[in-house]
Amino acid sequence: TATITLTSADIAGDPVNVSTTATCTKAGATTDLDQTTGLNRVHLRSATNKVLLAANAEGDNLAAKVYIINKSTDPSLYLTITINAQTIGKLYGGDWMFFPWSQTDTSANIEVAATNWTSATGDIPVEYALFHEDTDFLTNA
């Protein structure tokens, strides 16, 4: 089960308070996802794309959810997240994302790049986890 709560007094003209829960289930079923890579940590030292999770063609049509967080405390050090060479988002220091991952082919790798990284900025810690339904999902990180 994944829960997200958004609360803000100043994002709109009126206060915003949204909370929703989703049960992470297998594709086309009511059975919960039962596999995970566990929480992993890498220290990014590159402004070029690095494979965080490698796509597996057998993963197409199976349910998978991905969690990624930029653990940097410096808001200017952001990560660019791509799938199949398409940018899906940027995570600034402290930002995170949780999204479904459909592996349509082996080019659907999830890659990260430390966009503003230089050797002077030091490592950018990134944590991630894959929740999935099939034991054939493997990561290379």
Where are these regions (language model features)?
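C-terminal interaction-tip segments
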Residues: 1-13, 24, 116-141
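N-terminal low-complexity, intrinsically disordered "leader/linker" segments enriched in small/polar
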Residues: 1-56
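Hydrophobic beta-strand residues in large extracellular and virion-surface proteins
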Residues: 4, 42, 68, 79-81, ...
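Hydrophobic beta-strand segments within beta-rich accessory/binding domains
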Residues: 49-55, 64-70, 111-115
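Intrinsically disordered, low-complexity Pro/Gly/Ser/Thr-rich segments with frequent PxxP/GP/PP motifs
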Residues: 86-107
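Noncatalytic modules at the cell exterior or secretory-pathway interfaces
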Residues: 102-123
